[in-house]
Swiss-Prot record:
Source superkingdom: Eukaryota
GO molecular function: growth factor activity; nerve growth factor receptor binding
Pfam families from the UniProt entry: NGF (PF00243)
PROSITE patterns: NGF_1, NGF_2
Database matches in InterPro entries: Brain-der_neurotrophic_factor, Cystine-knot_cytokine, Nerve_growth_factor-like, Nerve_growth_factor-rel, Nerve_growth_factor_CS
Cited Gene3D superfamilies: Cystine-knot cytokines
Cellular component GO terms, alphabetical: axon; dendrite; extracellular space; synaptic vesicle
GO biological process, one term: negative regulation of neuron apoptotic process
Native organism: Morelia spilota (Carpet python)
Glycosylation-annotated residues: N93
Gene name linked to the record: BDNF
Name assigned to this protein: Neurotrophic factor BDNF precursor form
Amino acid sequence: GQGSLAYPGLRTQGNLETLSGPNDATRGLTSLADTFEHVIEELLDEQQVIQPSKENKDADLYSSRVMLSSQVPLEPPLLFLLEEYKNYLDAANMSMRVRRHSDPARRGELSVCDSTSEWVTAAEKKTAVDMSGATVTVLEKVPVPKGQLKQYFYETKCSSKGYAKEGCRGIDKRYWNSQCRTTQSYVRALTMDNKKRVG
């Protein structure tokens, strides 16, 4: 991307036309899907090194949603897309097991809570709490040899429309109360503490 942090690249060789016959094509697609899923799992496993403290139950595991760039990134971060794809694979595996018994009209999937995602800078949120519980200043701009880059965060939050106030989808409101709410997560970002130390 445009002056952004480097992400690991995924490369495949050949294309579907180079495969011979339907059986070979099926084997090739299965092999490619297995390889892609294996790479995704390895990347996601590496991201689950940092654990939040037990007191902060709203905190998720560490996820990479930070990018340094000279302009607003045009796409979501790669690891976010990989997480979404893995969730899709998990849901697909589950639906394949129950597909025979399900009504065709009910096979579509909807999120329990509607959400929106966008890139934001430290201009919107100037302070944060680090993993030791200290309040730190989030750096909006980072100096580099040829100028400066902005630090962008890919923020996902509950949608202000729809089910956020009415409760979660799929919950029987006659018996249960539910609520969609945005939770906090830890990310690796450039910050400054009260002693002006940057890290």
